[in-house]
């Protein structure tokens, strides 16, 4: 488990199929302990979380990031939250759905991104003095310092997807934590802008 900032830790699982890391987050913020998009984790990390944290919630950013949520719900006795538009498309039953503009436990704001690969794709914004943007499949970090959209064939209309991403630029963030690939911890807003304009 790697510490990104106080209250934000990340672990990764390398996907041979996609040839990039699938990332999960452990957030300990505002009296809550939250997992985001949990991929498989090492036994030592799972044990450390079980011994050191009382996980309240597991937040999923889209229908394709269920990953290890069921095992985490069982092991940590946590509730699973998912986007309202994606929940009916998931095999995993969710405890609560969320939608655009909602404030989630721990102080995470929901930003629904229309016209993405899944109808409920959502980013999460966390303000801890420094702004952190958390994304699932909206943007990926194939190369360090650079963000990309998924391949164009994943979208009904890639230009509409890019237009939807402009919503992210309204938020005051310096770091973006990606579910797939390499996160950017400084000047991330400019990287988002470049990805939209590419």
Regions from the PLM with identified roles:
Residues 19-21, 92, 98, 118:
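Residues that act as N-cap/strand-start positions at coil-to-secondary-structure junctions
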Residues 84-88, 139:
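Short, acidic/turn-prone active-site loops that include or flank metal/cofactor-
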Residues 15-16, 32-35, 41, 53, ...:
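Metallo-beta-lactamase
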Residues 42-82, 175:
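Active-site metal-binding motif and surrounding structural segment of the metallo-beta-lactamase
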Residues 72-75, 87-94:
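Short loop/helix-cap segments at secondary-structure boundaries that form the rim of catalytic
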Residues 1-31, 169, 190-193:
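Zn-dependent metallo-beta-lactamase
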Residues 95-105:
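Short acidic-hydrophobic, aromatic-tinged amphipathic segments that line or gate anion-handling sites
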């Amino acid at each position: 488990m790697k510490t990104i900032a106080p209250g934000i830790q990340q672990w990764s699982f390398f996907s041979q199929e996609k040839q990039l890391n699938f990332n999960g987050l452990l957030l300990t913020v505002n009296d809550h302990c939250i997992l985001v998009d949990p991929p498989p984790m090492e036994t030592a990390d799972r044990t450390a979380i079980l011994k050191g944290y009382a996980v309240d919630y597991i937040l999923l950013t889209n229908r394709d990031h269920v990953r290890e949520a069921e095992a985490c719900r069982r092991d940590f006795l946590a509730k699973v939250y998912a986007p309202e538009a994606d929940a009916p498309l998931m095999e995993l039953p969710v405890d609560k759905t969320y939608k655009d503009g909602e404030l989630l436990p721990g102080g995470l704001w929901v930003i629904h991104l229309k016209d993405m690969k899944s109808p409920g794709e959502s980013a999460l914004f966390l303000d801890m003095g420094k702004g952190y943007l958390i994304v699932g499949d909206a943007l990926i970090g194939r190369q360090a310092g650079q963000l990309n959209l998924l391949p164009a064939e994943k979208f009904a209309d890639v230009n509409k997807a890019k237009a939807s991403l402009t919503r992210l630029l309204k938020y005051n963030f310096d770091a973006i934590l990606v579910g797939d690939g390499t996160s950017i911890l400084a000047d991330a807003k400019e990287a988002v802008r470049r990805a939209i304009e590419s």
